[in-house]
Amino acid sequence: MRRSHARSRVKNSSSSKSDMDPIKFQIRSGNRAPSSSSTYTLTKPNSKHAKSNLLLTVGSISVVLGVLFLCYSILFSGGNLRGSLRYSVVIDGGSTGTRIHVFGYRIESGKPVFEFRGANYASLKLHPGLSAFADDPDGASVSLTELVEFAKGRVPKGMWIETEVRLMATAGMRLLELPVQEKILGVARRVLKSSGFLFRDEWASVISGSDEGVYAWVVANFALGSLGGDPLKTTGIVELGGASAQVTFVSSEPMPPEFSRTISFGNVTYNLYSHSFLHFGQNAAHDKLWGSLLSRDHNSAVEPTREKIFTDPCAPKGYNLDANTQKHLSGLLAEESRLSDSFQAGGNYSQCRSAALTILQDGNEKCSYQHCSIGSTFTPKLRGRFLATENFFYTSKFFGLGEKAWLSNMISAGERFCGEDWSKLRVKDPSLHEEDLLRYCFSSAYIVSLLHDTLGIPLDDERIGYANQAGDIPLDWALGAFIQQTATETSQHAASGNLHWFHALFSNHPKTLHYLIGIPILMTVLVYLVTKWRKPQLKTIYDLEKGRYIVTRIR
């Protein structure tokens, strides 16, 4: 009985094993031998297949949506590629004031389109210039902050982060020592970094006088429609600022490399002579005259007598030094207490012109080139047409001269003004500050001495025109800097070929790239979580009565 029973048990065990083995095999390799008795083996492969199809479908949809979003960005919302308005900000750190320029422009057919009027251009100037804060660099932050707020009011807030702001300081800052320059620039960088605009430290700098002249030439020829055309049909620029004068024009004459600049627009290359004559601006030259007068080194401007009476030929007769003028001259004065008693206004235009010429020729004996017109600096012969800007224009306008007035007209106007009694001049122009009114005698003489006596422009030559704008475009070097910078960047992008649109879109709109990558990833994650949530939780148990495994769903 025991043996029989034992055999029976073994037989039953063998029978059970026979029943169980297929099920075990199906669990391990359900793809090879599916069984209708096992829910697990029937549903598992179909679940995997369905899940893969679902993920593939959702992934494809995500990619399609991303591509559609990209196309939409390029054609519509990424309008920088299709002509929507961009902005740029340039701050001109001049010698007498700081001016901010806010530009709006478009890119059409891969080229920048500029319109310096209406909503596309705004500017604001505050006094004094940055160089006035040499003893208090932190004081520069007040005016710079006000200028930045002005710009932020002209640029939509959503575009601040992609709007470049640059500060370019000129002659006033160039006169300062480098450590002082850096302190003021450090304050400027701190203000611009916190402005909300796109800014880098190197975008706040003191530019060279040569750069300033080139930028002025660029905006002048852009305004006249000659930029990008025949070099021989371009117009030269002569600027008379407060601290410096700039001369820039196309020249075929061989010149030392330090005076030569080469720039390109489109397929045209221009070889320019460009130089800034520091200390030869109108205000700086007038101060030189005063310095020579006070030091008694300038015989034509100073006529000392035994009573030490100093005569200024460029001051209209009847003029007496006021407190402000004495304060301005305090740095040059050796005997301040006696200045008021020893000063005499000469009111002599001819002597004033001679004094101005002496200032312009100062240093000629040190010339190391074949020809030097101003000081010891090489200057080629002027050719073509010229625009005389800034103080050339202001002086011409003050005397009521037209844009094409001859230099002989300037002489006549200067002679009348210098010879007039000061009291009568004050009555004619009561709104002008006394110091500004005083300078017009010297200015008229200095202009003739610079353009005719020094640069050789005939007195009746019509090649020269006095203007501060051409059409409705201001002839401001800052506009030229903006034009050249934008044109250069655009041409560089165009040179990169098919990647231009990609760079333009994603460099200016980084959020577009984030969306393009993020949307498909987000959708894929969401689908994964949903399928994970909807995936049935299965539990496998062994049924002793039926002698098989049973797979059940857990809720």
From Swiss-Prot:
Segment Disordered: which positions?
A: 1-45
**Keywords annotated in UniProt:** ATP-binding, Calcium, Cytoplasmic vesicle, Glycoprotein, Hydrolase, Membrane, Nucleotide-binding, Transmembrane, Transmembrane helix
Q: In which tissues is it expressed?
A: Detected in mature pollen grains (at the protein level). Also expressed in the veins and hydathode regions of rosette leaves.
Give start-end of the signal peptide. Answer: none
The GO annotation for biological process reads: anther dehiscence; pollen exine formation
- Fetch the InterPro entries from UniProt: GDA1_CD39_NTPase
Where in the cell does this protein reside? Answer: Cytoplasmic vesicle membrane
Residue positions the entry lists as glycosylated: 267, 348
Function summary: Catalyzes the hydrolysis of phosphoanhydride bonds of nucleoside tri- and di-phosphates. Involved in the regulation of pollen and anther development.
Q: What is this protein called?
A: Probable apyrase 6
The species this protein belongs to is Arabidopsis thaliana
Protein encoded by which gene: APY6
